Amino acid sequence: ERPSDLLSHGKRHTPTASLSPEIAANTITCISATKTFNLAGLQASTTIFPNKDMKRAFEEFWGRMDIRRNNAFSCVAMEAAYREGEEWLDQLLPYISGNFDYICDFCAKNIPQIKPNRPDATYLMWLDCRALSMTNEELRDFFIHKAKLGLNEGYTFGHSLAGFMRLNAACPRSTLEKAMRQLKAAVDSL
């Protein structure tokens, strides 16, 4: 449930554990301020367990995997973000939403072969590039060498995302405008 703070266009998040007592008893909830408040380098999160037995089993697993708890600095930073970051988040969400609008409008008008999928949460947007009729390798090479863009390849997230590329829209609008112009020029050159 990590991207639940990054909801777009008035969407609401329903925590999985709130659906029923039976579901709550079998749900481990993970939350983090790292994506929402750009604190990813702190590598910090919070895990909520429904019962002590499940928590104990995970602590044993974490110990075997040599995964440590959050450090003192990351805990203070997360607390500060949640306590003092509301104004920043209130400005961030419409900005990212505006970036999504820009991408959708730009593609519809200039690159109709690429169909952006507006997410309900997070700042990552899938671009459906299947109309370009490229293999995964061709699509990767096209984005890197022709468009000069380093996006995430969809197929690495599962076979159903072959032909998709993942774009990070949490950046200045000028960066997106440049990226979209580069993408248009690359598609036009096909």
Predicted regions and their residues:
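Conserved PLP phosphate-binding loop immediately N-terminal to the Schiff-base lysine helix
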Residues: 1-18
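A short beta-turn/loop motif at secondary-structure boundaries
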Residues: 7-9, 117-120, 157-161
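Conserved core segment of the aminotransferase class I/II
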Residues: 20-97, 104, 187
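PLP-dependent enzyme catalytic core of the Aspartate aminotransferase-like
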Residues: 23, 142-151, 157-190
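Helix N-cap motif at beta-to-alpha junctions
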Residues: 51-52, 131-133, 172-174
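Conserved glycine-rich beta-strand-loop-beta hairpin in the small C-terminal domain of fold type I
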Residues: 79, 94-104, 116-129
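A short linear hydrophobic-aromatic micro-motif
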Residues: 104, 113-116, 150-155
